[in-house]
Amino acid sequence: MIIAIDGPSASGKSSIAKALGSRLGFKFISSGYFYRIITLIAQKFTLNEYDLLSESKILELVLQNDIKFNGVDFLLNGVNVTSHILNERIDLQVSLYSSYIGVRNIVNKKLREIVKLKDDNYIIEGRDITTVVFPEAKVKIYLDASVKVRALRRYNQRDDDITLNELEQALERRDEIDQNKEYGKLKLAKEVFYIDTSYKCLDDVCDIIIKTFNLKKK
């Protein structure tokens, strides 16, 4: 069974998906980490956050590198890069690279291969997970929150010099990009269960999703 969790950046997708995985005994996968690894690959060949590779070049580089998920960590050519893909520079570019249709096709294929390779129960989170990648998921959840709340969450996770106001502006730009993508845009899927997490704690959101999950099982 698949529980698919969609929604904008910093809406709580990863934290809630991980907690749900622990409570339900499901395996957790984040599509966003794949896009971040691809952005990390690109940044090895660029000078700064304003320097972007073409779609054809990034696809060429992706095919030259081995990206894997071992059930816990994300590996690039056998090296654990999970802790290296959450930084401001990647934040600024990941939406741009993930807007490339070829890049999205590669990530979506990897996600489907992971699920197909081992018949198991999965919680998979990411933008367009409920609309494009796994529209057939038994349970589809869309998590949302205000920009101010999402910026504060991201601010509390960071240890760099970015300000709260800068994070708000970055999230607003990212929302605009994600909502206007030609392919895989951020939107509500059919039969999706919408949850505003702005003023809900993690356990309360998990309880709501588990109730939905139990109803869908019947």
From Swiss-Prot:
Catalyzed reactions: CMP + ATP = CDP + ADP; dCMP + ATP = dCDP + ADP
Q: Name one GO biological process term.
A: pyrimidine nucleotide metabolic process
GO CC annotation: what is one?
cytoplasm
One matching Pfam family is Cytidylate_kin
Among CDD domains, the record links this protein to: CMPK
Where it mainly occurs, coarsely classed, is cytoplasm
Q: Which UniProt keywords apply?
A: ATP-binding, Cytoplasm, Kinase, Nucleotide-binding, Transferase
Give the intrachain disulfide bonds: none
Q: Where in the cell is it found?
A: Cytoplasm
Q: What class of enzyme is it?
A: transferase
User: Nucleotide-binding: is it a keyword of this entry?
Assistant: yes
In alphabetical order, the GO MF annotations are: ATP binding; CMP kinase activity; dCMP kinase activity
**Is Transcription among the key words of this record?**
no
Enzyme Commission number: 2.7.4.25
Where does this protein hold ATP?
G7, P8, S9, A10, S11, G12, K13, S14, S15
Which superkingdom? Bacteria
UniProt family annotation: Belongs to the cytidylate kinase family. Type 1 subfamily.
HAMAP family, per database record: Cytidyl_kinase_type1
Q: What is this protein called?
A: Cytidylate kinase
The organism encoding this protein is Borrelia hermsii (strain HS1 / DAH)
